[in-house]
Amino acid sequence: MDQKILSLAAEKTADKLQEFLQTLREGDLTNLLQNQAVKGKVAGALLRAIFKGSPCSEEAGTLRRRKIYTCCIQLVESGDLQKEIASEIIGLLMLEAHHFPGPLLVELANEFISAVREGSLVNGKSLELLPIILTALATKKENLAYGKGVLSGEECKKQLINTLCSGRWDQQYVIQLTSMFKDVPLTAEEVEFVVEKALSMFSKMNLQEIPPLVYQLLVLSSKGSRKSVLEGIIAFFSALDKQHNEEQSGDELLDVVTVPSGELRHVEGTIILHIVFAIKLDYELGRELVKHLKVGQQGDSNNNLSPFSIALLLSVTRIQRFQDQVLDLLKTSVVKSFKDLQLLQGSKFLQNLVPHRSYVSTMILEVVKNSVHSWDHVTQGLVELGFILMDSYGPKKVLDGKTIETSPSLSRMPNQHACKLGANILLETFKIHEMIRQEILEQVLNRVVTRASSPISHFLDLLSNIVMYAPLVLQSCSSKVTEAFDYLSFLPLQTVQRLLKAVQPLLKVSMSMRDCLILVLRKAMFANQLDARKSAVAGFLLLLKNFKVLGSLSSSQCSQSLSVSQVHVDVHSHYNSVANETFCLEIMDSLRRCLSQQADVRLMLYEGFYDVLRRNSQLANSVMQTLLSQLKQFYEPKPDLLPPLKLEACILTQGDKISLQEPLDYLLCCIQHCLAWYKNTVIPLQQGEEEEEEEEAFYEDLDDILESITNRMIKSELEDFELDKSADFSQSTSIGIKNNICAFLVMGVCEVLIEYNFSISSFSKNRFEDILSLFMCYKKLSDILNEKAGKAKTKMANKTSDSLLSMKFVSSLLTALFRDSIQSHQESLSVLRSSNEFMRYAVNVALQKVQQLKETGHVSGPDGQNPEKIFQNLCDITRVLLWRYTSIPTSVEESGKKEKGKSISLLCLEGLQKIFSAVQQFYQPKIQQFLRALDVTDKEGEEREDADVSVTQRTAFQIRQFQRSLLNLLSSQEEDFNSKEALLLVTVLTSLSKLLEPSSPQFVQMLSWTSKICKENSREDALFCKSLMNLLFSLHVSYKSPVILLRDLSQDIHGHLGDIDQDVEVEKTNHFAIVNLRTAAPTVCLLVLSQAEKVLEEVDWLITKLKGQVSQETLSEEASSQATLPNQPVEKAIIMQLGTLLTFFHELVQTALPSGSCVDTLLKDLCKMYTTLTALVRYYLQVCQSSGGIPKNMEKLVKLSGSHLTPLCYSFISYVQNKSKSLNYTGEKKEKPAAVATAMARVLRETKPIPNLIFAIEQYEKFLIHLSKKSKVNLMQHMKLSTSRDFKIKGNILDMVLREDGEDENEEGTASEHGGQNKEPAKKKRKK
């Protein structure tokens, strides 16, 4: 039969073939086809013949085709056919599909849809036919019966697609079904059906099956619905990430983790690559991605951003067209996230309303962590983002040349956090990705070298961390580091020091790098620039510290803790200690040459030698011998000669120029510290060992010299130095400059000898008498210099250099003076205690050291760079100062003795204030340890019991002591009130209050105590009032919103200053006694306005957040109506805040404020108030349809603004302008040009915000009209539209002024400017 059909088909006409086919029974043809296909014979040719003999022009032929199609589809799905045969059959069916009439196409399509929905497909091969059927159907123009109605082919296709997408899809055919739609012409609506269906299948599929489905979706997105595709993919993987993190965070209920981490990351990586590839082919997709993620920035950026979407954005940066805008989007998101965090941390009001969320910074670092799973496409974007953040938000140079570094007040700023995040991104990326390391290192070094004039500490910190992580790995990049060495001579000293310190571990593992550095340093030592020479000294000293000679004491013996990286390097590099000794001695030889260079170079050497000894004790002889031979040049060996030092030799005279050549005081200081260290550390370890006599004599020599200098300095008079009162100390003559230098040298030597004698005194009375004699020499010179500087009306001579006393000594001295109660010490200590001036000097030096720590992060002198030692000294000093201040109050001390300068108690308090600030700045993690050290009752045995005492409890104990002191001060009469001490006490309390936990009872007690002080004490000191009120506000905002407090204060201000209407008598409320006629304005007024501004900022932030949520949730009316319910508490809080603030402004706009900053600030804040009200109205314009109107409390707020604020604003404007006119008038009368100019400038400043305010009011009213129409509530009934504003321009007056143009050009110009400013809002009002 098959042969006959084939032979008939070979004829030119199909008539005989048709006739033959009609004679066959129904099942014969299908059975024949089935047998032929299964056997793998000529099924294709047979099928072509059947189609040729079954033309669609005849009904019989059409039905036969229909049956053959059904048979073939079943055959292909059965899986019995060979692949080639099945493909051939499907190909033929595709070719013939277009010949089918519409109704049969509909039937065929329904068959497919039923098979898909019922899951009866076996292998899905036949699905390749469905897109052809749907395409063919869309081309049919005639109307077709579908369901109960009649539809066109296009409409039928739409219904069929809808039916298909609304039914069940078997998991294994999802990809195939999605893929087939790319071959069907689809409308936007049809694409949306398909996309929604495919996205809904994500959660039902195996993870490995999602990438190919995403690929098909991206191909399909070229037809439309790009936004839905991207949103769906991002939302799914963001949710999966969140679920995965929750599972990994150790939820005990989840025994099995849903998805292994590695598998999830690989799948995400593949999908990101698919999307990036799709964007390269379709830029519209990229624009849609950026647009979608940008929307999130308007509200809450954390809603749209997730680790997955961030990784996707970073990968997109590889496409040039999107690189800048994507990095800019990420940069903006990071800073916005940190600003939001800052705002939340500073306000309890916001914390109660906004739940804690993960921040963009955390997500980005998670991306870095995830990128270990072969996400190479993300790394370049991470590196670029890291450098952009560091470049944009690193420390900046300010006007006086100083750098704004990370300090406590600034470290919480968003910019600082963003810069730190950039460094963390780069460091973590460096650790994970080997291929990118060289690029990161190169870019960091480039910035260090090329931006020397800008602050680059953040890049040096990053470099240090990179080197610390893997010094051995970086050997491969050593060429980059050695290139940087070539620029050392041209870099600032501080940069050189930090750069060399950062790369120091590399020098231990790379000898070639070390040799290269030495060559560079030797050249620099003889460079013309002073900074280059100093850099050479810094470099050599660093090498001496870190290349230990065999036999040197270990770091523990030297009480010097080395960094983990250093130990790491030491373990891995078995360097030759003998070679090190030769190397170090060569360097010492080079450094000796520096002793003939400028004073600054020598000074660096003296300051560095002590650290060299501690780290490399075997160099002690070499160092000490160098120092001794240098000292002998300036030491007078004859025991009877006075003075004992040759000061003339320390000064260099070149023509008229006089300068210091030898910093003798620092040389002696260095000798004294090195000698003390050697005696305390090395000699005890050498006891019992035979030591060369020469060495013993050596150290005895130094002791003898210091002893001789001490004795002769005590005997010397100022005349011996030619520095008595009659000497010339002016800065304008060469003799004066020389005498100043000598005076400072003598004072420095005295300080060094004071410390030396105290260290060897063993509490000997004679030694202490010597110390006092040395101090008196110091004091005399200091007094002369101050007196001469005072007469010359210049503070040049008073700029004393840092004290040469070490911080450790200051700590020991203060403890001895104020806390030593050992009986055997009392007689000798009474010598020092008898001099108040000496005790004041000791406290002053402690203050100087703490100030130095606050400004630079370290102190001068030994261990000044060691944070641990500094912290220990700080604890000891604080304990003493605290005891001294609380034991002997200032009032007691000052009543006893009337001396010039501050009392010791006041100095102690000032010291405490500086220390509390410094500890929070540099030792935040050690606060607990610090507070425990202050507890005088603490004993070592009790430490374990006290370990669980919280920081808050310890802080509260300290706070109570200062509260008592302040109460005692406030109980005194106004004339006896010590404002300096009060101010310091409030500053200390403010500093300590930051350590209290806001939820603790101690915090509440502190707040109520501060509030009580403000309510019950009236002081006219403006600075004290300001600091106390600032404390009150800072506590209040951490506990609850300050709006009620602001309202009460505004009533007090109104009561004291009176009303703008002089006929109105204001009732005085007196909530806070601290507000009085002297402090009400400008002090308290400006403070409350500043706080009001912060509240408005918070409210504005909340409104923006709500608006962002609404714009994202308006996908459907149902979604948005459900979304408004959780927002109700936030809306209510916003309205409550604005309502109370409205009453606050209601009081202030009626207050007769003095001209100046108060009026100016009030007008600006009123403008902000109306802008915020407008923002709220616009929010309700967005939501009022879905939420069913506006809430009643919003109506009340609008009513309040119309009755209590707007009319009063216009009255206040009139009041301000009337005051301006009176000022003008009085200015003209006096006819003093300077006075007139000043008055006019003030008028201009105060009236400038008026047009802005009027415009803000009118904008508010404009949007209220829109809201009234939309909500069907008449909100404007409460608004009194002013028609008689006296700031409108009157035509006749304007003409008169214009005619007088030539008479007074300046004055008239100003008036017309005012007119122009005020005219615009008035016009707008008339337009309404």
UniProtKB/Swiss-Prot annotation:
The C-terminal 30 residues are probably required for function in DNA repair. There is a cross-link at K523 (Glycyl lysine isopeptide (Lys-Gly) (interchain with G-Cter in ubiquitin)). This is Fanconi anemia group I protein. InterPro entries: FANCI, FANCI_HD1, FANCI_HD2, FANCI_S1, FANCI_S1-cap, FANCI_S2, FANCI_S3, FANCI_S4. The modification Phosphoserine is found at S407, S556, S730, S1121. Monoubiquitinated by FANCL on Lys-523 during S phase and upon genotoxic stress. Deubiquitinated by USP1 as cells enter G2/M, or once DNA repair is completed. Monoubiquitination requires the FANCA-FANCB-FANCC-FANCE-FANCF-FANCG-FANCM complex. Ubiquitination is required for binding to chromatin, DNA repair, and normal cell cycle progression. Monoubiquitination is stimulated by DNA-binding. Phosphorylated in response to DNA damage by ATM and/or ATR. Phosphorylation of FANCI promotes ubiquitination of FANCD2, which prevents DNA release from the FANCI-FANCD2 complex. Residues 1301-1310 have a biased composition (Acidic residues). GO terms for cellular component: chromatin; cytoplasm; cytosol; DNA repair complex; membrane; nucleoplasm. It comes from the Eukaryota. Changing P55L: In FANCI; benign; no effect on ubiquitination and DNA repair. GO terms for biological process: interstrand cross-link repair; positive regulation of protein ubiquitination. GO terms for molecular function: DNA binding; DNA polymerase binding. The gene is FANCI. Keywords: Cell cycle, Cytoplasm, Disease variant, DNA damage, DNA repair, DNA-binding, Fanconi anemia, Isopeptide bond, Nucleus, Phosphoprotein, Ubl conjugation. Belongs to the Fanconi anemia group I protein family. Plays an essential role in the repair of DNA double-strand breaks by homologous recombination and in the repair of interstrand DNA cross-links (ICLs) by promoting FANCD2 monoubiquitination by FANCL and participating in recruitment to DNA repair sites. The FANCI-FANCD2 complex binds and scans double-stranded DNA (dsDNA) for DNA damage; this complex stalls at DNA junctions between double-stranded DNA and single-stranded DNA. Participates in S phase and G2 phase checkpoint activation upon DNA damage. Residues 1300-1328 are annotated as: Disordered. Its main location: nucleus. The keyword Cytoplasm applies. It is found in: Nucleus; Cytoplasm. PANTHER family: BC025462 PROTEIN (PTHR21818), FANCONI ANEMIA GROUP I PROTEIN (PTHR21818:SF0). The modification Phosphothreonine is found at T952. It comes from Homo sapiens. It is linked to Fanconi anemia complementation group I: A disorder affecting all bone marrow elements and resulting in anemia, leukopenia and thrombopenia. It is associated with cardiac, renal and limb malformations, dermal pigmentary changes, and a predisposition to the development of malignancies. At the cellular level it is associated with hypersensitivity to DNA-damaging agents, chromosomal instability (increased chromosome breakage) and defective DNA repair. Homodimer. Part of a FANCI-FANCD2 heterodimeric complex that binds and scans dsDNA for DNA damage. Interacts with FANCL. Interacts with MTMR15/FAN1. Interacts with POLN. Interacts with UBL5; the interaction promotes FANCI homodimerization.
